[in-house]
Amino acid sequence: MTMAKLTESMTNVLEGDSMDQDVESPVAIHQPKLPKQARDDLPRHISRDRTKRKIQRYVRKDGKCNVHHGNVRETYRYLTDIFTTLVDLKWRFNLLIFVMVYTVTWLFFGMIWWLIAYIRGDMDHIEDPSWTPCVTNLNGFVSAFLFSIETETTIGYGYRVITDKCPEGIILLLIQSVLGSIVNAFMVGCMFVKISQPKKRAETLVFSTHAVISMRDGKLCLMFRVGDLRNSHIVEASIRAKLIKSKQTSEGEFIPLNQTDINVGYYTGDDRLFLVSPLIISHEINQQSPFWEISKAQLPKEELEIVVILEGMVEATGMTCQARSSYVTSEILWGYRFTPVLTLEDGFYEVDYNSFHETHETSTPSLSAKELAELANRAELPLSWSVSSKLNQHAELETEEEEKNPEELTERNGDVANLENESKV
């Protein structure tokens, strides 16, 4: 009985909601460790480690935004931009509206043609050869509906023909012809834009499954890989990245999805890509980087998401195309590097996309970039890149002194030689 109460109380603690669950508290709360039997009795759906809970994505791997708009009261705004609304609809609804619009217009004008014939009395003089109807051979609603289709689609079979003794029919013919042209232009244009949308072009723009953090040119860098599967290239391709992470301001305001720019070469022009073969996009982790204070041990505890956006123009159509993807904490590998995919063959370069997502482990410090910089400045970490750079700087200074004062250097060498001779004597 005591064990059951203990299990129930621990379950309530783990399932309890907290208003400040997204705000990091400076006070560490240590939960008592349960006996093994009590831990086994806990429900399996309860996680004992909150750091291992799944992070909710803001942008999915396929590029679709995981956001649903609710309680939208001003729905009339969608009707003010009816063309964009129709283009954004799914194909099944778009085709249904396409068929319904034409069917309704045919039925509407067919009903009007039948009413004109009925009011004029054409239905009562069908077999009277001396009677001049509004539309010849129109003897019911079905024939009026067929005449409406022939008029709007300009088929013109010639069996049903409007006569010159019916001015209201002539006016209706003009109205239906004009409205039919407008409907054709609107619906065909909508279908054309729907078909020519560059969304499917983004399907052949691929991103690596994981992002990696490793050393590159003596600096800690965050890297991911992008590629284009088509032979027709993306013109004016550019890449940018955003960090999505919760934030609490100094005034106490909580921002659940704060967006921070990640520099992937904006100031140097490296963000503009010539995407003929797969490229590795690199972000240098420096003082301006949001990853400046994140180490290997701290990375799994962070709840963050990196959204990458690749934009460019489709070479065939000239329309702007955008591809998106994202990386959560579990998809960022510390101490790994991408496997090369480009090889030189006989007269051409070959890309092996089987190795596009592959990574291999490499030697990488587990400290954060800030800690590495502090240790390098205090000369407590014998980093090869810092030592070599200091030696190079010392050699350059000596070379500059020799070029500026060659006479002083000659006198200095002469004095040294005289001192050596005196010491020998």
Curated annotation (Swiss-Prot):
Tell me the Gene Ontology biological-process terms attached to this UniProt entry.
cellular response to morphine; potassium ion import across plasma membrane; regulation of monoatomic ion transmembrane transport; response to electrical stimulus; thyroid hormone metabolic process
Intramembrane stretches, per the record, are 141-152, 153-159
List keywords of the entry alphabetically. Ion channel, Ion transport, Membrane, Phosphoprotein, Potassium, Potassium transport, Transmembrane, Transmembrane helix, Transport, Voltage-gated channel
Ways its activity is controlled: Activated by phosphatidylinositol 4,5 biphosphate (PtdIns(4,5)P2).
Membrane-crossing residue ranges in chain numbering: 92-116, 169-190
Pfam families, per the entry: IRK, IRK_C
Extent of motif PDZ-binding: 422-425
**Single annotated GO MF:** G-protein alpha-subunit binding
Q: Which InterPro entries match?
A: Ig_E-set, IRK_C, K_chnl_inward-rec_Kir, K_chnl_inward-rec_Kir3.2, K_chnl_inward-rec_Kir_cyto, Kir_TM
Could you name the domain of life of the organism this protein comes from?
Eukaryota
Q: How does it sit in the membrane?
A: Multi-pass membrane protein
Q: How does it assemble?
A: Associates with KCNJ3/GIRK1 or KCNJ5/GRIK4 to form a G-protein-activated heteromultimer pore-forming unit. The resulting inward current is much larger. Interacts (via PDZ-binding motif) with SNX27 (via PDZ domain); the interaction is required for recycling to the plasma membrane when endocytosed and prevent degradation in lysosomes.
Q: Which PANTHER family match?
A: G PROTEIN-ACTIVATED INWARD RECTIFIER POTASSIUM CHANNEL 2, INWARD RECTIFIER POTASSIUM CHANNEL
Q: What is this protein's function?
A: Inward rectifier potassium channels are characterized by a greater tendency to allow potassium to flow into the cell rather than out of it. Their voltage dependence is regulated by the concentration of extracellular potassium; as external potassium is raised, the voltage range of the channel opening shifts to more positive voltages. The inward rectification is mainly due to the blockage of outward current by internal magnesium. This potassium channel may be involved in the regulation of insulin secretion by glucose and/or neurotransmitters acting through G-protein-coupled receptors.
Report the sequence similarity comment from the record.
Belongs to the inward rectifier-type potassium channel (TC 1.A.2.1) family. KCNJ6 subfamily.
What is the protein name stated in its UniProt record?
G protein-activated inward rectifier potassium channel 2
